[in-house]
Amino acid sequence: MNHLKSFFTALVAGFILTACSSLDISDTRPADVKTIDKSDIQWQQHLKQIKQIQHYSSQGQIGYISSKERFSSRFEWNYAAPTDYTLKLYSTISSTSLVMQMHNTGMTISDNKGNRRSEADAKALVREIIGMDVPLEQFAYWLKGQPDEKADYQVGENHYLASFTYPLDGTVWSADYLNYHEEKQPALPKDILLKNANQTLKIRVDNWTF
């Protein structure tokens, strides 16, 4: 088990050396964002359309920063259900890749060299092997710009989700939606900044399929 953990640690470290150029997304949350009321008709119509997207995939780049880890990589995300999704992290420079696959009995993490590890507790496995402590259950909704309607969220003047804060597991996550693919129907996020007190995720989505 220790050998496998060491291998994955080295694998993630490899992303630091071989990853794409750093994302040009600021670490700082934007200030003075103009917002509109949540009852806005265009926002409510947009939210309804977002909710109807149940199965989707996206590709882009992700940057992760914490006191223990710092890396940037390409990603492919495929989502079908809370117990059926896959996140692949990979480098375009080398053959390095890592796949997190959720299934009915938990999560399996594997790499391009055939190493794999499965556990029922997906979040604990990701934390142990990769060092990331991210809210996997919520990520599928946050990525497409769908807030928890009971949470504190703001709608921008563009009639899309601008930001939200969400308390979870003793910490508070914030999300800022900096740019959208407005050529899509419905418009879907392009640049996202996710933060809590100890972690920062920068996400740039290049392509959406649904």
UniProtKB/Swiss-Prot annotation:
Keywords from the UniProt entry: Cell outer membrane, Chaperone, Lipoprotein, Membrane, Palmitate, Protein transport, Signal, Transport
A cellular-component GO term for this protein: cell outer membrane
Keyword Cell membrane: no
Signal peptide feature range: 1-19
GO biological process: lipoprotein localization to outer membrane; protein transport
InterPro entries: LolA/LolB/LppX, OM_lipoprot_LolB
Pfam families: LolB
Topology term for the membrane: Lipid-anchor
Residues lipid-modified (N-palmitoyl cysteine): C20
Compartments in which it is found: Cell outer membrane
Main subcellular location: membrane
Lipidated residues (S-diacylglycerol cysteine): C20
Cross-referenced SUPFAM superfamilies: Prokaryotic lipoproteins and lipoprotein localization factors (SSF89392)
Gene3D superfamilies: Lipoprotein localisation LolA/LolB/LppX (2.50.20.10)
Disulfide topology: none
Family as reported in the entry's similarity comment: Belongs to the LolB family.
Subunit structure and binding partners: Monomer.
Function: Plays a critical role in the incorporation of lipoproteins in the outer membrane after they are released by the LolA protein.
Protein name: Outer-membrane lipoprotein LolB
Organism: Mannheimia succiniciproducens (strain KCTC 0769BP / MBEL55E)
Lineage: Bacteria, Pseudomonadati, Pseudomonadota, Gammaproteobacteria, Pasteurellales
